[in-house]
Design a protein with these regions (language model features):
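Conserved small-residue
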Residues: 13, 33, 40, 68, ...
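Short, intrinsically disordered C-terminal tails of secreted or membrane-associated proteins
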Residues: 316-325
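Short beta-strand-to-turn element immediately C-terminal to the catalytic PLP-Schiff-base lysine
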Residues: 98-102, 176, 235, 262-266
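Short, well-ordered amphipathic alpha-helical segments that serve as non-catalytic structural scaffolds
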Residues: 7-9, 132-148, 174, 178, ...
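Condensing-enzyme catalytic core mediating Claisen C-C bond formation in acyl metabolism
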Residues: 74, 78-147, 156
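Conserved catalytic cysteine-centered active-site region
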Residues: 1-39, 64-66, 70-91, 172-202
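Acyl-CoA/ACP chain-elongation machinery
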Residues: 48-70, 75-86, 117-131, 159-168, ...
Length: 326
């Protein structure tokens, strides 16, 4: 049997960059990368770190494919998040990272701030979400509260939106409970990239940050008919040039480990073009592992070395910094 440690990629990248400080791997299924981002932000908030590389990677294998097939939640065609006819997800693989930096050690022009975050554990079922969306409701509500903004100020929601009957119904119920009849524009990018599991929020955090930076709302592919439980209709076309100030991004894992992140423009730092991060890095790769974080200030030139390990298809480099704890 060929195997490797679950933190193999974490250790490999740390070794390649000569990192000997704080290194860890988080494995909480589909919320892994979101929890890595939160951990990095909280450690910086409490002055345990100056900077942190946070995110996740995951790769397809037969074990994963067979596992989801046994749950009967794989769609044999293209997945259809939030559509009435949805039957399951499409698996993907990839990686995405943010580099968070403290305000005091900020050196480069960044994109935005991580203004809020929350993790909840509803423990409703080993692989399913509660019909009322309790875990999703709590994680979104607490992330919004920790940011100090009101729900009506959110401009876009990057939903978890796997395309499975249970997840989308549960998340939809949670959205209705928080926003009522005034749900902000939302969409799932998983119809584009598939569900990348432990890497999902690493990649989708990048999408969320770029939504703010570029004024974009991404389309929810393959949607034709609203699900009767909520009647919610996602965005189905690319919106450009939209003033996006606050983006809520959801990642919900097996066992009810639900996490939400809130990315925001900061008025003061927008004027100075310095927000709450140092760098943003994204890649789509064929590699296996989960999130990691590190100590010390990381410069863009060093961050670029990460991508030489895996021949990335997509590479994005730019600056940023993290926020206050909840």
């Amino acid at each position: 049997v060929i195997s490797h440690d679950c933190g193999a990629s974490t250790e490999l990248i740390a070794s390649y960059l000569g990192i000997n400080d704080f290194i860890t791997t988080i494995s909480t299924a589909c919320s892994s990368a979101a929890n890595a981002i939160m951990l990095g932000a909280r450690m910086i908030k409490h002055e345990l770190l100056d900077a942190a590389i946070v995110g996740g990677t995951d790769a397809l294998c037969r074990f994963t494919l067979n596992g989801f097939n046994s749950l009967m939640i794989l769609d044999k065609t293209h997945c259809r998040p939030f559509d009435r006819s949805r039957t399951g997800l499409n698996l993907g693989e990839g990686a995405g990272y943010l580099v968070l930096q403290s305000e005091s050690s900020l050196q480069r022009t960044p994109y935005c701030e991580l203004s809020g975050y929350a993790n909840t554990n509803e423990a409703y079922h080993q692989t399913g979400s509660s019909p009322e969306g309790d875990g999703a409701f709590l994680s979104m509500s607490e992330a919004i509260a920790s940011s100090g903004i009101s729900p009506k100020e959110i401009d876009y929601i990057n939903v978890h939106g796997t395309g499975t009957p249970g997840n989308d119904a549960s998340e939809g119920m949670a959205l209705r409970r928080i926003f009522g009849e005034h749900v902000p524009p939302f969409s799932s990018v998983k119809a584009f990239i598939g569900h990348t599991l432990g890497a999902s929020e690493g990649i989708e955090a990048v999408y969320s940050v770029l939504s703010i930076d570029k004024g974009l709302i991404y389309p929810n592919l393959n949607f034709t008919d609203a699900m009767p439980e909520t009647g919610l209709i996602p965005e189905t076309s690319l919106q450009e040039g939209i003033p996006i100030r606050h983006v809520l991004s959801n990642s919900f894992g097996f066992g009810g480990n639900d996490s939400s992140l809130l990315f925001s423009v900061n008025e003061f730092f927008q004027h100075e073009r310095t927000f709450k991060y140092l760098s943003l890095c994204s890649q789509f790769i064929f590699n296996a592992s989960l999130p990691f974080i590190r100590q010390r200030i990381i410069h863009q030139e060093i961050i670029a070395l990460i991508f030489r390990l895996t021949n990335p298809i997509i590479r994005i480099l730019s600056p940023m910094r993290p926020c206050a704890d909840a």
